[in-house]
Amino acid sequence: MNQASSIKRSIVFFLVPDFSMIAFATAIEPLRIANRMLGYEAYRWRLTSTDGKPVKASNDVECAVNASLEDERRFLQREQRPSMVFVCSGVFVEEFRNKSVFAWLREEYNRGVAVGGLCTGAHILAA
């Protein structure tokens, strides 16, 4: 394994209820394929929700998650700290009002974690 192959990126996908499955899939699949083509895990990811419970996408498919917001706050202080956070949302995003999520996103950003949005995730980032 060379030095380049030891560099790993950890990505958190924060799933908002009614998130766009197609936006999520088109973000995560290239990471999976890159790992396969490289022959090592250059990218790892976890799915997060506010409470750690499954989140239903806009197509009614329910996705299990790996962590809650509380878990992510703890991870920020440890080696599980992500390189990036993507907010995955979709329809009805203007109804999403969660001060804990907004504060957590600011914490991530202030600690040097790249933060971005998928589909209408930019709407949440602008809040």
Where are these regions (language model features)?
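Extended, subdomain-level signal for the structured scaffold at the beginning of enzyme domains
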Residues: 1-115, 124-127
